[in-house]
């Protein structure tokens, strides 16, 4: 692939790691953020200490606070901003674009209020005149491992398979590999909802439960994620792939996962506001729990784990009681899809 110019919007842990992957592949990478001190640090010291204490970035990676400069004459734009500001940043990009680009996103969540997936937001805010079909980059991927060039396999999903193949070539190298998919609904739904199950898995650990319980919540969590995804129009096979069970395993079993750590702290009795303050990072699983619960209620989809976590976070229920209540739910077949 010829050298591409790429703007990466969001210099958080994942945005920074993906910027390095793209830089390793010989592309011109521009990181954009709105924290002046962080941008200056990246440009001057070639570090991003808030997220990576011992990592030095390539000096060719340039960082910007001016969005217009960051996206000027680029071939593609990668959104890696928190869900809650995706629409705002997309509006800003739409007002500045002067030519057609490939639009990608690598965030995982659902918009509060509208319940929309992130690709839908980007489609609504950025005119087709200036973009390809949206490409979703998602899968089992800790930034802490990708940044040290550990082997990572994820998915590039788009309704336009050629756009997905472009992104596949853009990122893939000897340690980072992408597989294509056209099931955008499934890939985005899996990526968002696995954060809820990771909170639950972390809570089980914090409460002192063992591997049996953790395996159960991950497996039954996958079942309810799939149930909702299918109701939304997803291909059930997607949930057995990298962006489904793969992402759920890596997020639901690892201390690298901020959602798992948040659940662990909840299980140990910490208050949510203290957890969010101490972590200093967005915990997408918290807001996604509310959105997923509301969607499930609207569509009458059975999601007991999501409901239990929702009641603990938003209704003040005891997390242990909520989990134990699930053990007395009505008996069901393992393969029920409603």
From Swiss-Prot:
Belongs to the NAD-dependent glycerol-3-phosphate dehydrogenase family. This is Glycerol-3-phosphate dehydrogenase [NAD(P)+]. The gene is gpsA. One of its GO terms (cellular component) is cytosol. Sn-glycerol 3-phosphate binds at residues 108, 139, 141, 194, 247, 257-259. It comes from Streptococcus agalactiae serotype Ia (strain ATCC 27591 / A909 / CDC SS700). Keywords: Cytoplasm, Lipid biosynthesis, Lipid metabolism, NAD, NADP, Nucleotide-binding, Oxidoreductase, Phospholipid biosynthesis, Phospholipid metabolism. Its EC number is 1.1.1.94. InterPro entries: 6-PGluconate_DH-like_C_sf (IPR008927), 6PGD_dom2 (IPR013328), G3P_DH_NAD-dep (IPR006168), G3P_DH_NAD-dep_C (IPR006109), G3P_DH_NAD-dep_N (IPR011128), NAD(P)-bd_dom_sf (IPR036291). HAMAP family: NAD_Glyc3P_dehydrog (MF_00394).
């Amino acid at each position: 692939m010829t050298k591409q110019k790429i703007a990466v919007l969001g210099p958080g842990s994942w945005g920074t790691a993906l910027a390095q992957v793209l830089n390793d592949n010989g592309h011109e990478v521009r990181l954009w953020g709105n924290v002046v001190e962080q941008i200056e640090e990246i440009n001057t010291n070639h570090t991003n200490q808030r997220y990576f204490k011992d990592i030095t970035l390539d000096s060719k990676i340039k960082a910007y606070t001016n969005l217009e400069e960051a996206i000027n004459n680029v071939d593609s734009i990668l959104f890696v901003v928190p869900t809650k500001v995706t629409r705002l940043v997309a509006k800003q990009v739409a007002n500045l674009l002067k030519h057609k680009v490939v639009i990608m996103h690598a965030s995982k969540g659902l918009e509060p209020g509208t319940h929309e997936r992130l690709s839908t937001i980007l489609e609504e805010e950025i005119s087709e005149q200036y973009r390809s079909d949206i490409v979703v980059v998602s899968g089992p991927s800790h930034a802490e491992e990708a940044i040290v060039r550990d082997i990572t396999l994820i998915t590039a999903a788009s309704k336009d398979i050629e756009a997905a193949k472009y992104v596949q070539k853009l990122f893939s190298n000897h340690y980072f590999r992408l597989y294509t998919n056209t099931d955008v609904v499934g890939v985005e739904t899996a990526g968002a909802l696995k954060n809820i199950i990771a909170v639950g898995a972390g809570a089980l650990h914090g409460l002192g439960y063992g591997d049996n319980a953790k395996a159960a919540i991950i497996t039954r969590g996958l079942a309810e994620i799939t149930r909702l995804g299918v109701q939304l129009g997803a291909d059930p096979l997607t949930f057995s792939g990298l962006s489904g069970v793969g992402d759920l395993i890596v997020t639901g079993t690892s201390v690298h996962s901020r959602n798992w750590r948040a659940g662990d702290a909840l299980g140990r009795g910490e208050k949510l506001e203290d957890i969010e303050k101490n972590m200093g990072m967005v915990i997408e699983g918290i807001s996604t729990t509310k959105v997923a619960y509301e969607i499930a209620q609207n569509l009458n989809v059975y999601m007991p784990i999501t409901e239990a976590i929702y009641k603990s976070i938003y209704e003040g229920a005891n997390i242990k009681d909520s989990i134990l209540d699930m053990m007395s739910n009505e008996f069901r077949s393992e393969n029920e899809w409603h």
